[in-house]
Amino acid sequence: MSMSHIYTVVRCPRCGKPVPWNETQRFRPFCSERCRLIDLGSWANEDYAIPGEPIDPAEPSEDRNGAEGPPTD
């Protein structure tokens, strides 16, 4: 067996279908454009969320350097 036929198989995050992890799979890790777009829509609808502390919009934000938001002249 040639080494070029060995590849990893992952599961589509949307439907669970096996997907070969190689250059020929255009929508990897998804099995199809449909599953990719459904997943994108789920993010847009805020069905998914990355855990974190709630943000209070009344408090000024700080950037990585510790500076506060834009000047309020």
Curated annotation (Swiss-Prot):
Q: Which family does it belong to?
A: Belongs to the DNA gyrase inhibitor YacG family.
| Keyword annotations | Metal-binding, Zinc
Question: Which protein is depicted?
Answer: DNA gyrase inhibitor YacG
Q: Which residues bind Zn(2+)?
A: 12, 15, 31, 35
Q: Which HAMAP family match?
A: DNA_gyrase_inhibitor_YacG (MF_00649)
Domain of life of the source:
Bacteria
**Record note on cofactor:** Binds 1 zinc ion.
Quaternary structure, per UniProt, is: Interacts with GyrB.
Pfam families in alphabetical order: YacG
Cofactor(s) demanded:
Zn(2+)
GO MF annotations, alphabetized: DNA topoisomerase type II (double strand cut, ATP-hydrolyzing) inhibitor activity; zinc ion binding
Quick one: where's region Disordered? 47-73
